[in-house]
Amino acid sequence: MKRTTTIKIVLVAIFSIVSMTSVRAQRVALTSNLLEDVVLAPNLGVEVVFADTQSLFLEATVAPFKLTNHYYNKCLSFRAGYKYWFNQALYAHHLILDGVVTSSESGWGDTALRYEYLGAGLGYGYSFIINERLNLIPSIGVGVAYVRQYEGHDHMLDTGYGVQATVTGGFMPMLTRLALTLQYVLK
């Protein structure tokens, strides 16, 4: 997927979340997926409660790191979605309907793999309350994703030459969400 399309999707998601804040006073929370942090993919998200049992969220992940010349994993990912909370928003059980768009490139030795991922899924999570403002939320989700994969030598992926011969893609069932999220409630 082209970067301009990705940027448009992110802007629409941000606009949607911001427009919901004018409805009435909201609770807002900042989130970070600790599992992504462990694999050196810093991420940050925002969740806005717009009804007693409903919230919208937007998360971004970026991994620009190149560990060595022979091993690297670069990633840019955006996730937006809707949560239905069974009791009260930001507490206890909830269902998740979300979409994700990811562009990633990994390299080891002289071989490189690039993929683009566009998926949507349904998930479940539970919010463990640590204190008044801090929650820990494990969640998991499954769904369908369109994955496009490019395979070749490292120098071919950077220039684009020779990559077209090794392109594969298609729809497949996938684990669309696996998270251990630390959530800080702002208000």
What does each model-identified segment do?
Residues 27-29, 63-64, 105-109, 160-167:
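Extracytoplasmic loops and strand-loop junctions of Gram-negative outer membrane beta-barrel proteins
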Residues 82-86, 172-187:
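Outer-membrane beta-barrel "beta-signal"
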Residues 20-25:
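Sec/Tat signal peptide C-region and signal peptidase I cleavage site
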Residues 1-11:
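Bacterial N-terminal signal peptides that target proteins for export
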Residues 30-37:
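Short strand-turn segments of transmembrane beta-barrel domains in outer membranes
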Residues 9-19:
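Bacterial N-terminal signal peptides
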Residues 48-138, 184:
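Gram-negative (and chloroplast) outer-membrane scaffold detector with strong preference
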Residues 26, 38-40, 72-78, 114-120, ...:
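Residues that define the transmembrane beta-barrel architecture of outer-membrane proteins
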